[in-house]
Amino acid sequence: MAADLNTLKQDLTRRMDGALETLRREFAGLRAGRASPALLEPVRVDAYGSEVPLTQVGNIGVPESRMLTVQVWDRSLVSAVEKAIRDCGLGLNPQTEGQLIRVPLPMLTEERRNELAKAAGRYAESTRVAIRAVRRDGMDQIKGHEKKSEIGEDEAKTWSDEVQKLTDHYIKRVDDALVEKEKDIRQV
């Protein structure tokens, strides 16, 4: 039965890791004070008759802390890339120089920082909910094993404690990531 506990923990760990990875991707899209290529990664460009990720039509660079650049590989796509960046909803104003697009990042207002911090909090809370759902599923599996008399009451308690420790660990990681992101957002 010990192997079953390990299998259960591995499954729950994999699923909780997935929730944490989703949070990291969502946080990467929240623009803080510094430039990061992750800011433009979700941008999709109308190219070759379909929408493709920006990373498939050019290189994203960070020449300085408040500037991103996009080196577009195909000259015919420069205006489409510029339009996609302008329309992505991040309030960016790209400037084109040949096949290089410069994207200066404006200073964040206090109001915008508060909005970003609230969004980060919402992302963190939805991740906590996802982790708790994984925990609930694990607890249900343990109860199922106990009902089928596959494990005893003491073993079920031990397993439940292990699942709770795992859940607490991941919730703490979410909280730590949120504190770090809020600090990043509020940094002037």
From Swiss-Prot:
Question: What is the organism of origin for this protein?
Answer: Granulibacter bethesdensis (strain ATCC BAA-1260 / CGDNIH1)
Kindly list the biological process annotations in GO that this record carries. cytoplasmic translational termination
Q: Where in the cell is it found?
A: Cytoplasm
Q: What does this protein do?
A: Responsible for the release of ribosomes from messenger RNA at the termination of protein biosynthesis. May increase the efficiency of translation by recycling ribosomes from one round of translation to another.
Primary localization class, coarse: cytoplasm
Q: What is this protein called?
A: Ribosome-recycling factor
Q: Which gene encodes it?
A: frr
Q: Does the keyword Metal-binding apply?
A: no
Which Gene3D superfamilies does this entry report, sorted A to Z? Answer: 3.30.1360.40, Ribosome-recycling factor
Which Gene Ontology molecular function entries are recorded, alphabetically?
ribosomal large subunit binding
